[in-house]
């Protein structure tokens, strides 16, 4: 047997030791049937969540708890729904584009921090002769 069990009577703990790579591989290759299934919300549940989101996009814990009980949805799923919905709204507000940290914009400034080229490089371009004397 590749798994040994040890019971320490003093500490009353049960410890398993895995002795082989085979057991580790077997554990990692377990079927996905033990994986929890995704919660599918009904149209009515989504309508209630959306209407509450319009009122308050950051509900307090009491409101989330009430929604959880009223809709028979775990509290954690309510929290995640609001988090995802806020992210969706932010993406829609930003036009769906990703922003890079220092994307150049037309007037020679950088979007992040609004630093001009002149502030980044104090000498003129193209370099003038005075720099090479």
UniProtKB/Swiss-Prot annotation:
GO cellular component: a single term: nucleus
Protein name as annotated: Homeobox protein HD-5
Keywords noted in UniProt: DNA-binding, Homeobox, Nucleus
GO MF term list: DNA-binding transcription factor activity, RNA polymerase II-specific; transcription cis-regulatory region binding
Coiled coil, from the record: none
InterPro entries: HD (IPR001356), Homeobox_CS (IPR017970), Homeobox_domain (IPR051775), Homeodomain-like_sf (IPR009057)
Chain spans, region Disordered: 86-109
Residues annotated to bind DNA: 34-93
Compartments it resides in: Nucleus
UniProt-listed Pfam families: Homeodomain
Disulfides per UniProt: none
Gene3D superfamilies from the UniProt entry: Homeodomain-like
């Amino acid at each position: 047997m590749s798994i040994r069990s040890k019971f320490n009577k003093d500490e009353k703990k049960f410890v398993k030791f895995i002795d082989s790579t085979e057991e580790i591989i077997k554990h990692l290759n377990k079927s996905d049937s033990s994986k929890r299934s995704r919660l599918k919300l009904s149209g009515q549940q989504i309508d209630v969540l959306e209407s509450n989101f319009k009122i308050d996009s950051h509900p307090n814990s009491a409101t989330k708890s009430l929604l959880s009980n009223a809709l028979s949805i775990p509290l954690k799923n309510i929290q995640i729904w609001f988090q995802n919905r806020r992210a969706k709204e932010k993406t829609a507000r930003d036009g769906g584009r990703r922003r890079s940290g220092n994307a150049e914009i037309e007037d020679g400034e950088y979007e992040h921090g609004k630093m001009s080229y002149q502030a980044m490089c104090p000498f003129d371009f193209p370099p003038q002769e005075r720099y090479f004397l």
